[in-house]
């Protein structure tokens, strides 16, 4: 019964096995081998059941087939202890390329794929292949792998693996098949990093018939970016595989991932299927990767004199602090890393490559360093160890590659020879690499193979917290120079940042700006809603962190915020200027009325200082006065005066307000007496009737806001007091009597017209008598002891008691340096006040210019009179010494003692009452004058800056004119004239005009003047005399004479008729701006030495007067045409240089031919020294000399930078005549680099991308740029690309740009590409320069020091770095931008002139051909009427051209053949299209200043015109005009041209056709 029972059980088991086999066969889970194995196991079990029950029956239960899962999900999770999980692990482990990968991969979760449709498709494909007669080895099932993410995993599980998921093209097009990995540990191109996690998708595949493909790396890499590379699928095949796939033996091998791929595809009837059916998803396994060593073995117990604890915790986490390469004498030993178990700290930052070439014996090291530092137990603590004053840290060196025995061989050598490798570090530090076994016997017994790295240094490398750093006792507060108000703006910024978190209405910076303005506005207005943000102090306790890493926080918004900041950083920026503007807009100043009481908070400090300097009695008196006066007190007035002074200052530099009421200190009085005197004077002020604020403002030049409240009572009182004072102080009895009469009449009401005339009379008196009597120095204060001509000592003391703060404030406005050089200056103290004493009767003339009550003076009486023509007592001659501060009289005045100057100034300064009353309600020296002065000062400063930048010598700058009214100037309106003041420049213009006329009449050479009424001759002669300097002045300033002479010459020639008032006015303004002080000084000196001046003027004016006589006889149209012809000839003239090693007949013929054409031979050195931008240089070289001589052209690098330099190669003279020469160095350039630029260890792929993109930007069809790489460097990149990812990326990048023709790989060079040669050498670069001679620039790119290549620049090669090439590209190749400063200077000096036609086109690149036919101007006949302005401008242009050509080409003056009168042809006038007046370009003073030295010799006219090659419609090389031999021939030539203008229009047309 038992036997039957066992048999029945066996049959039942067999039936269940058959059912499970059928089910598994339908699902495709088990193949035929598995079914056969299962049947074998069943049969053995069956046969064993016939006998007794075997003892192995109990263990048989472990192999029972589980019941079919009811889970219908696509991914079914498998437990880690199940049989399916173990089978998947076996599949993975058996598919490793490296056996050590088993310890690096850890698998966590496995999931089986359940997709019946895909499984049936797979089974159907297998049956189809078997039906087609495929071999059994082609039908074998295997497993392949793919690294996927979560999205790909679910898509593949449901739909299968479709084509197009990969970008590789190694085996075929990715759009027609799928790529899968052969090995389970080689899942991507880059090595896996430690800690990487992911999912591996396992596919069950049938390889079928495989196509073996050769490795076409170049084609694959070039087509990898387009995605169209690779082979097409082959019919009747299912897979592509690389032929040398089995050659890959290491994970880090060259292109190991690409070379171990399978390429699966499937053909349908007429197309490739999107999903190969013989690729079936099988399972998904989650993995984690760790590159750790195997568990270390604990060391044996120590035995020796030094005992250390032997227990060691191996669970401690380690930190990798450095990864890189270890090299020995440049040879790679291994890839290694430094690991530490004591903490993530390393004392030094090591480079990626460590070259260890120093070896020291261990015994030598022990003598200098304590041996205890080499023990690992010394460095158990996380802090650095210290013994014997030496700090140390110990790390372990771990080999990273694990593929060779390089490191093990190194360790054996160190152990055997008892050595240590040494690497010197910064700050007297060292790193020792040693094998630990020689140190102690304990390590010798352990036999550990870990190399140790010991860092030793003399100072601790730990960073101390801020709290532990001692603070120095003298703490200097931080200064915010870029924005002093930053402490005010930072709280506003905090407020705006807080508010902007909830405000997303606009860009971030706009929102921040809006809320910042709100905060600042509330702060300024002090609203109730305003709450000031106070910056909290930093808590130093935050420096002490308990743990190294902070607790995790929610950072979901960090990614979006960083992305918006990186791609739109401008939205997070507020410029400093805008922040300052926001602060300035919200500043609130205290508003007040000029006539109301006001108490400025900011001026309390000044008033307190003022009160501190006064005695107690003075303060008490002021308090009494302020209590009596209901309108104002002295403190308020002082504050108001300070404010007005700040507003009215013409320059920002002002003195202390406390010095406002100070008096000039006298040497006769002590400091104490001076202060006491000052207090007494202020006490006298209190006894005077008080003044209102309206009168004070009116006296300072201001106006009341309500004009209807003004009365005339104060004016009458002012006049009465003034006349009384004048009558008492005047010596002349007649004048005193007249003043008394006026005083009696002043008690009655004066008509408005009389008051106006009287006010103007006082103004005229101030102008004529001194015009500078109320000007004081800014750093000094005037003494209030004012004196007139014959006052007694008692009267002087009485006058000294009167003072007025307003007058003193007005006196301090004008600056004394400006006053001394004013274009309309006043008399200085030295001129008005002789040192004889106060009783001198010469002072009477100061009062002779006071008109008495509507007195009328003629025009001649008010005009300036020179010293020679004036009477002894004529006060009009007092102007002669006004001028530059460097005049001898002014120097004498400056060197006098201070009390003399004070005394003289006290004699000429009006009294307190007089000055107070002279300031009427409508003061003429008020606000308008100061506004004009401010504008004038700004203009002067800008002009001085331009002159300094252009290195133009100039004398003391001109000061603003002293503005005052004048009866002789017509008034626009009487009402308007009362409110504003007139600008007194007419008297100065008349003075200048009269002086110029007198100088011209005295010194002009009458015999040289052909027309007395010619404005050109008069202005030229007057200008030369006006700007002439004596010999001693020229010696002291050698360049000043040349500059000002030519500048004034051409500026005056450009002006209109000199006899018109407008012309004189313009000349006066120009002289005042360009050097009036120098001209006045020269005028004074010329009057003192007339014989020197007369002789100098005669010598200087002879050449120009001779030319002027000739030109004055010409018709203006003829002259215009001649000037334009000469201008165009100079514009198209080309200098040349023939470069040859030895002189030959060809070069000599070329030189002679070009010299006959009027061109100039010029060496490159001299051409570079000249600064003329219009010059052009053509360098000619024979074609056969180019390989050996082209790089020896002097200054070749500098010449290439200039666009006006061209190069031509010729074989004979005919090449120049027929335009068949070889153009050299046309445009563009090429770059050659050395090994430092393509070093993968130092250069990143981003830097090269940026460089190549820049090269692509500058490349154009007109200027081709290319990077030429030597074969040696390209080969090295391919070798390093197998192991170095950066090298592979660089190689791919170069290949991409090689297709764009921006990179060229040079062929093999025998001179520099061998291994023992350095590439590129200088000879190689010179050959490349000759080989690519059409490209203009040759650049040698290196990251080394440029000083190591000194000879490269001498051979036309520019040495630069990659960054410098991109940043300074324009400077390297010579791109020049126009000079803005020069344009400003030309606009400033040539205002009102129009631009000549040649100037408008000067910026365009001109034709460099020596015989250019382009741009030949058409022949026109000018029929404009006579215009003096045009003739004067033409004279200036002609003189400029003549002088310029004399200087530039003196060697070509007499080289042409001298023609006879019969050979002379009439010159047809040629003009460039445009107007004929005002279009001639005016040369600057720098160009003409160098030519003035030629003015002192007799200039022959033939020399001036003989070297011009005049252009017609014939070619520049085809015709040569005859030279002029003497002035008579020139006149005949010009007359012939003039006669052509009188012929009918038909003759002009016929003549034009003939030409």
Curated annotation (Swiss-Prot):
Residues 61-71 have a biased composition (Basic residues). The keyword Transcription applies. Residues 1402-1417 have a biased composition (Acidic residues). Residues 35-47, 692-702, 744-761, 1448-1458 have a biased composition (Polar residues). It is found in: Nucleus; Chromosome. Residues 1-74, 645-711, 744-773, 870-911, 1390-1462 are annotated as: Disordered. It comes from the Eukaryota. Keywords: Chromosome, Nucleus, Repressor, Transcription, Transcription regulation. Pfam families: DUF3715, PIN_TASOR, TASOR_alpha-beta. GO terms for molecular function: chromatin binding. Residues 667-688, 888-904 have a biased composition (Basic and acidic residues). InterPro entries: PIN_TASOR, TASOR, TASOR_ab_dom, TASOR_DUF3715. GO terms for biological process: negative regulation of gene expression, epigenetic; protein localization to heterochromatin. GO terms for cellular component: heterochromatin; nucleoplasm. The keyword GTP-binding does not apply. Belongs to the TASOR family. Component of the HUSH complex. Component of the HUSH complex, a multiprotein complex that mediates epigenetic repression. The HUSH complex is recruited to genomic loci rich in H3K9me3 and is probably required to maintain transcriptional silencing by promoting further deposition of H3K9me3. This is Protein TASOR. The gene is tasor.
